[in-house]
Amino acid sequence: MEEKKQQNVTIKGTKDGITLHLDDCCSFSELLKELDEKLSTHYYDGDGRSLIEVHVKVGNRYLTEVQQEEIRTLIRNKKNLVVDSIESDVITKEEAIAWKEETEIVPISKIVRSGQVLHVKGNLLLIGDVNPGGTVIAGGNIFVVGSLRGIAHAGYYGDSDAVIAASVMNPMQLRISDVAMRAPEEKEDGAEAAECAYINENNHIVVDRLQLLTHLRPNLTKLERGIV
C-alpha cells in the first residue's frame, strides 16, 4: 500500500479570499515547490479581473524578510492573487526584547525636577513627584505615586488607550498619544485626590476619579490594577 504523501501546503477558501497553511517542519525549498505546484491550478482564476486576497499562516516557522518576499513574489506571479498577510507564531529574540520593553512596568523612585525629562518605553511607575517644569514620558501608561505638577505624556508611540494616574493631579500639561490637554485650574488646598486621565469617545482627554480606571480600562494587567 502506497504511503500517503505529507501535505506541506493546505489551502482553505474563506469569505475574504483564501488562507494558506504552510507546514513548519519541511524545508523551505520543499515548501516553495509544493506551493508553486498547488497555486498553478486553475482554481483561483476567478473572472480574470478580481483580485483574491491571500492570508499566509506559517505556524512555528520563522521567516526572514528575504523568505517572506520569496513567498509574496511566488503568489503574486499567480493570476489574480495578492498577499494580504503573512503570520508566524514565533518572533526573534530582538523582537521579544522590544515587546518586553514596550509592555513591562518600569518602577523608578525619584523626584523629576524642573528641566528634567524621564522617558521609558513601557509603562512608568514613578514613586515620587514631578515638579513644575519636569516631564515624564512613557510608551504606555503613567502611574505617579506622588504629585504630578509638571508635564506627562503617555502613549508616546501612538497608544490612545494609555492612561495617566497620580496621587495628586495638578499638571502643567497632559498628553496621551497625539491629544493634549492644558492644566485645569489649580485645586484648592485639601481638595486634592487621586485621579486618572484618559481619552474619551470624543477624542478629548478627561480627568476623573481614579476609582473609575479599572472600569474604563478593564484590560489593565493584574499588576497595574493593583497599583490603582
Swiss-Prot record:
Coiled coil: none annotated. The keyword Acyltransferase does not apply. GO terms for biological process: cell morphogenesis; division septum assembly; regulation of cell septum assembly. Keywords: Cell cycle, Cell division, Septation. It comes from the Bacteria. Interacts with MinD and FtsZ. NCBIfam families: minC. Cell division inhibitor that blocks the formation of polar Z ring septums. Rapidly oscillates between the poles of the cell to destabilize FtsZ filaments that have formed before they mature into polar Z rings. Prevents FtsZ polymerization. Belongs to the MinC family. This is Probable septum site-determining protein MinC. It comes from Bacillus anthracis.
